[in-house]
C-alpha cells in the first residue's frame, strides 16, 4: 500500500468515525419508566406559572412515553379547543421523542419538510416537549391556549424545570 492510499484509508475511516459519532450524538433519548401522577402534577406548575405571569390562559397535558394521558389541567377562560390540542402536542412530543417545534420548523422550511404532514400523530405546532429524567424520556408535556410561541414558552419552562 502506498503512502497516499494509506492516508486516504485513514482519512476515510476518520470521516466515517466522525459521521457516526455525530449521528449517535443526535440520537434521541431512550424511553424510561412512565412519569408518576405526582411528578406529572409537579411538571405542569412551571407552565401554569409562566402563563399566569403573562396573563395567558392555557390547557396543559402530561402523557407517559406511550402517549397515554397521565394528568391534565385547564386554566379558567381557556378556549375549549385547547383541551385536545394540548394532549395531542404532548402525545406527539412523546411518540416522536422531540419538541413539536421541530415539526413546525420542518414544515415551514417546505420541500422535504412537507413530509411532516404524512406522519400520523405528528403535531407541527410549538408547545410540546419531552420530559427527561436521568437521560430517559418518562413522558411529555403539551400546552395550548395562547399563540404557538407562547405555548412553547410555557411548555419549555416545565421541560427545563423537570430535568
Features from the language model and the residues they span:
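Flexible, solvent-exposed loop/hinge segments and secondary-structure transition points
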Residues: 24-163
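N-terminal signal peptide c-region/cleavage motif recognized by signal peptidases
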Residues: 20-22
